[in-house]
């Protein structure tokens, strides 16, 4: 593995805070609005929809008549079944996260009458801007290391999927991407090796830490005290404790940071074998190459651009680490 100076950042990116197509508070059925007010113990007098993310579920910050604020997510099982299921899973996971994990606390949940509704602690924070600054990277990576420690082993009370359960099929995306012409020309000579690295990574990335797996800037809030909060705990799996840190470093590399230098600076990543890091990149690269070429869903017209950005970031970092030719 070789390291080199940082790249220029990838310039094409999704618009911040404007990627989701969500229902507003007024568009929720009246019975759901009444449920939320009743469970919160006060009328909702103001609602601010969250424009970030790539899912179509309701997600809004609500101001109550008594001055309190809550964050509420909701999805109906008839038209948004996969998202209702993910909210149900998130409620179960939030309920058992230890206090040491900086996640908004679950206040209550409702799972009946065709709707899954979650009310959570409202965090007065902002998303870290992109491109990443070094200061924000340090805050987030510090918080991820602390969370990994607090979540090893995973807390009892939930059946946590293994890494292979959720990621075991991803190596197959390399053949699918090659068959559909989605592999960039500079990577075509390395398709077989990338497929092998991806397959090997499923075992290397297994572990006994409950990992968030979806640590993007729109799932992070930083408050006035520089406390980092991780949101959207839908897709947690048991994995290697460094997995979430690698996800953030991948985005940092795409923003022009020297991710290999950052690997060496962090206690949780500095001793990782090259095969694990390269396998991580190959695994996500094959998946993102394939998904970026799929038709855009009506739930988020920006999803494929987002996935294409991550494919380019993973391809660049993997090529640099293995001294392969990079795209011009």
Name every feature range the model reports, one short phrase each.
Residues 2-47:
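Juxta-kinase regulatory segment immediately upstream of eukaryotic protein kinase catalytic domains
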Residues 51-64, 71-72, 196-243:
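Active-site acidic catalytic loop and adjacent metal/ATP-binding pocket
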Residues 70-112, 130-146, 252:
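A conserved alpha-helical element in kinase catalytic cores
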Residues 242-271, 281-299:
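Active-site activation/catalytic loop segments of kinase-like enzymes and analogous catalytic loops
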Residues 20, 259-261, 267, 288-328:
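ATP/Mg2+ or Mg2+-diphosphate-binding catalytic cores
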Residues 2-9, 110, 115, 127-188, ...:
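A cross-family kinase active-site recognition segment
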Residues 39-46, 89-90, 177, 193-204:
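Short Pro/Gly-enriched beta-strand edge/turn motifs at strand-loop
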Residues 118-125:
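Short pocket-lining segment of the protein kinase catalytic domain that shapes the ATP-binding cleft
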């Amino acid at each position: 593995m070789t390291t080199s100076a940082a790249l220029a950042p990838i310039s094409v990116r999704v618009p911040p805070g404007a990627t989701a197509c969500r229902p507003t508070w007024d568009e929720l059925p009246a019975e759901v609005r009444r449920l939320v007010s009743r469970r919160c113990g006060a009328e909702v007098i103001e609602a601010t929809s969250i424009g970030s993310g790539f899912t179509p579920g309701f997600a809004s910050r609500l101001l109550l008549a008594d001055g309190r604020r809550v964050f509420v997510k909701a999805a109906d099982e008839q038209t948004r079944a996969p998202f209702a299921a993910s909210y149900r899973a998130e409620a179960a996971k939030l309920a058992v996260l230890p206090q040491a994990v900086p996640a908004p606390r679950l206040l209550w949940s409702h799972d009946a009458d065709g709707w899954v509704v979650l009310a959570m602690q409202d965090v007065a924070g902002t998303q870290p801007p992109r491109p990443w600054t070094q200061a924000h990277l340090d805050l987030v990576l510090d918080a991820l290391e602390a969370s990994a420690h607090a979540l090893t082993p995973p807390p009892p009370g939930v059946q946590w999927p293994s890494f292979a359960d959720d990621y075991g099929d991803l190596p197959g995306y390399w053949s699918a991407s090659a068959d559909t012409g989605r592999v960039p020309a500079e990577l075509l000579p390395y398709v077989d090796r990338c497929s092998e690295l991806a397959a090997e990574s499923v075992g290397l990335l297994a572990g006994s830490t409950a990992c968030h797996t979806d640590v993007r800037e729109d799932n992070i809030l930083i408050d006035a005290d520089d406390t980092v909060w991780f949101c959207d705990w839908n897709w947690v799996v048991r994995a290697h404790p460094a997995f979430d840190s690698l996800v953030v470093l991948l985005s940092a590399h795409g923003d022009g940071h020297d991710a290999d230098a950052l690997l060496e600076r962090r206690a949780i990543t500095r001793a990782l074998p090259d095969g694990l890091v390269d396998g991580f990149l190959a695994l996500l690269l094959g998946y993102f190459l394939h998904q970026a070429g799929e038709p855009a869903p009506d739930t988020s017209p920006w999803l494929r651009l987002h996935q294409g950005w991550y494919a380019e970031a993973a391809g660049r970092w993997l090529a640099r680490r293995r001294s392969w030719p990079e795209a011009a």
